[in-house]
Amino acid sequence: MEFPSNVKYTKEHEWIRVEGDIAYVGITDYAQEQLGDIVFVDITTEGETLEKDEVFGTIEVVKTISDLFLPVSGEVLEQNEALADNPELVNQDPYGKGWLIKIKPNDSNDVNDLLDAEGYKALVNE
């Protein structure tokens, strides 16, 4: 299981990676492993400004649908269009090609309130 140090984590198993004034958001390796085979990603918030912990979409696996929560407040700029035809990218490369949305955070310093790799690893190993 991967715990990259270049991202921050939430207790709901999302990750965020800030690159300049934008950020990428996805689900963690632990989350995709627990969910199983992802069959559909539904993101309907593109162009909207959301608050931290608001639902920005859902992810569907064979037996359930799970909400996806925004790690920090910001505008949803783009969804990963590749997931429409290849939702399994979330399983195969959760921190790379399997990213879910690109956002413009209201305050990039909010990321500092999230878990680092060691904190997240401790959370999932409880």
Curated annotation (Swiss-Prot):
GO terms for cellular component: cytosol; glycine cleavage complex. Keywords: Lipoyl. SUPFAM superfamilies: Single hybrid motif. Binds 1 lipoyl cofactor covalently. The keyword Manganese does not apply. GO terms for biological process: glycine decarboxylation via glycine cleavage system. Residues 22-104 form the Lipoyl-binding domain. Coiled coil: none annotated. The keyword Signal does not apply. The modification N6-lipoyllysine is found at residue 63. Its cofactor is (R)-lipoate. The glycine cleavage system catalyzes the degradation of glycine. The H protein shuttles the methylamine group of glycine from the P protein to the T protein. Belongs to the GcvH family. The glycine cleavage system is composed of four proteins: P, T, L and H. This is Glycine cleavage system H protein. It comes from Phocaeicola vulgatus (strain ATCC 8482 / DSM 1447 / JCM 5826 / CCUG 4940 / NBRC 14291 / NCTC 11154) (Bacteroides vulgatus). The lineage of its organism: Bacteria, Pseudomonadati, Bacteroidota, Bacteroidia, Bacteroidales.
